UniProtKB/Swiss-Prot annotation:
The modification N6-(pyridoxal phosphate)lysine is found at K229. Pathway: One-carbon metabolism; tetrahydrofolate interconversion; Amino-acid biosynthesis; glycine biosynthesis; glycine from L-serine: step 1/1. This is Serine hydroxymethyltransferase. GO terms for biological process: glycine biosynthetic process from serine; tetrahydrofolate interconversion. It comes from Streptomyces griseus subsp. griseus (strain JCM 4626 / CBS 651.72 / NBRC 13350 / KCC S-0626 / ISP 5235). GO terms for molecular function: glycine hydroxymethyltransferase activity; pyridoxal phosphate binding. Its main location: cytoplasm. The record marks H228 as: Plays an important role in substrate specificity. It holds the Pfam family SHMT. The gene is glyA. Its cofactor is pyridoxal 5'-phosphate. The lineage of its organism: Bacteria, Bacillati, Actinomycetota, Actinomycetes, Kitasatosporales. It comes from the Bacteria. Signal peptide: none annotated.
Length: 419
């Protein structure tokens, strides 16, 4: 049989077995990592299409390769759809990831050595917002801002630091922060010091698309996002900007940072943007929010707090909950491992003023997007919250909790058509 036409199982049973095992893991467990979601079958079909074969350096109508007439159509559809979804003047759908979207935006707006401001990593920021070991911390002078004692971004500190440091760019966005940001206040501060405002909405873009979270696009010069997480599409990135900055942004992506775009992924992005414009998507995002609030409310009850578990900022406005374990018998790694043994996948996460090392941490980040995509409603999220609350206590019935996790997974079959 020709290798060109062999199936994965026929050609490479070792890789096929690992893929099959991962499918089973996703089907049989509860995915609660806040940055993860389940891509629709149509999205995966587009990503696995023949578009993976096509090189297309450049942009629609201006390519450096022949034979791009069909990928031009696909990419323009993606551009038009995401501009409409968020009300943006311009969009670049080529970044391979959110990190590359952030890098390209910074390359377009900054010079090495310029000053930037971003949320401190331990306070909820992202690597690309100025961490020293990241390109953003190596190329630019970074002035981090922080959350206050209540766990909310300290806008007075942001304003003070901006006036003192006169940054060229202020980054508003986060990777582990449970509250909404005041984009209008960030823009006012940016304007006062002559800085660009870049919003990284990778985590909450789906909520914005559904009208359940303030839209940063009217306030920011540039907005970056991933296309997975709450958007629920393929893994990739996007940059939205004003028309005035579009040429700089496009040049920073190609040829500045990337060569050929991944047109099969761009096709998958286009499909996911169509889904995100629909009513079913909006209803799912509401269940995502409701689920996170149900979880947060359960974890602040006395039977949980008395064993040293607390919720940062006291609750959530978004799709995730940050759990503080500093006063618990468990550290972040132990809590993650315990939930994993029960069939619930979360991730340990640093919290503000965390006394433990990064690979251990004193916190958990727990998200609801994947379960909402799977179909979970309020009753189901209440059951999940009860399971997690029980598991974080010193004494718990592992067998009972495992059985309850299995029952929830079986109630909402995932990808039943995939074998």
């Amino acid at each position: 049989m020709s290798l060109l036409n062999s199936s994965l199982h026929e050609l490479d049973p070792d890789v096929a077995a690992a893929v099959d095992a991962e499918l089973h893991r996703q089907q049989s467990t509860l995915e609660m990592i806040a940055s993860e979601n389940f891509a629709p079958v149509a999205v995966m079909e587009a990503q696995g299409s023949v578009l993976t074969n096509k090189y297309a350096e450049g942009y629609p109508g201006r390519r450096y390769y022949g034979g791009c007439e069909h990928v031009d159509v696909v990419e323009q559809i993606a551009i038009d759809r995401i501009k409409a979804l968020f009300g943006a003047e311009a969009a670049n759908v080529q970044p391979h990831s959110g990190a590359q979207a952030n890098a390209a935006a910074m390359f377009a707006l900054l010079k090495p050595g310029d000053t930037i401001m971003g949320l401190n990593l331990a306070h909820g920021g992202h690597l690309t917002h100025g961490m020293k070991i990241n390109f953003s911390g190596k190329l630019y002078n970074v002035v981090p801002y922080h959350v206050d004692e209540s766990g909310v971004v300290d806008m007075e500190e942001v304003e003070r630091l901006a006036k003192e440091s006169q940054p060229k760019l202020i980054v508003a966005g986060w990777s582990a922060y449970p509250r909404q940001l005041d984009f209008a206040a960030f823009r006012r501060i940016a304007d006062e010091v002559g800085a660009y405002l870049m919003v990284d909405m990778a985590h909450f873009a789906g909520l914005v698309a559904a009208g359940l979270h303030p839209n940063p696009v009217p306030h920011a010069h540039v907005v970056t996002t991933t296309t997975h997480k709450t958007l629920g599409g393929p893994r990739g990135g996007v940059i939205l900007s004003t028309q005035e900055l579009a040429k700089k942004i496009n040049s920073a992506v190609f040829p500045g940072q990337q060569g050929g775009p991944l047109e099969h992924v761009i096709a998958a992005k286009a499909v996911s943007f169509k889904i995100a414009a629909g009513e079913e998507f909006k209803e799912r995002q509401q269940r995502t929010l409701d689920g996170a609030r149900i979880l947060a409310e359960r974890l602040v009850q006395p039977d949980v707090t008395e064993v040293g578990v607390s919720v940062l900022s006291g609750g959530t406005d978004v799709h995730l909950v940050l759990v503080d374990l500093r006063n618990s018998e468990l550290d972040g790694q132990q809590a993650e491992d315990r939930l994993h043994e029960l069939g619930i996948t979360v991730n340990r996460n640093a919290i503000p003023n965390d006394p433990r090392p990064p690979m251990v941490t004193s916190g958990l980040r727990i998200g609801t997007p994947a379960l909402a995509t799977r179909g979970f409603g309020a009753e189901d999220f209440t059951e999940v919250a009860e399971i997690i609350a029980a598991a974080l206590k010193p004494s718990y019935d592992a067998d009972d909790l495992k059985a309850r996790v299995v029952a929830l997974a079986e109630k909402f079959p995932l990808y039943p058509g995939l074998k």
